[in-house]
């Protein structure tokens, strides 16, 4: 297996987790812990899939899903995507420039 296949799996895991989270109500998402992670195995490689939950206001919660593959000595690859959900259920994507802190 090649690294590009690993990165494709990381992207796929992010998309799947975001799809799952988008199905949940605002009240459920707002109660998620600020950070939770789990280890994923892809061939011989392991990476971390993390969910970041940030309550931006009483009416808005931001969810970011991040995949991180650690290579060595603090060097690795991070990918991230996310959305913001309003109390009324409206969902907007987290802008690209605001995702940089997660990559």
PLM features: residue spans?
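Flexible, low-complexity segments enriched in proline/glycine/serine and punctuated by aromatic residues
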Residues: 1-103
């Amino acid at each position: 297996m090649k690294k590009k296949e690993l990165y494709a799996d990381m992207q796929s895991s992010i998309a799947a987790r975001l799809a799952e989270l988008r199905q949940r109500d605002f009240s459920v998402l707002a109660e998620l812990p600020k950070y939770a992670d789990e280890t994923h195995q892809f061939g011989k490689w392991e990476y971390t899939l993390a969910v970041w939950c940030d309550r931006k206001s009483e009416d808005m919660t931001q969810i970011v899903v991040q995949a991180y593959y650690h290579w060595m000595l603090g060097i690795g690859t991070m990918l991230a995507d996310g959305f913001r959900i309003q109390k009324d259920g409206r969902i907007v994507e987290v802008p690209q420039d605001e995702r940089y802190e997660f990559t």
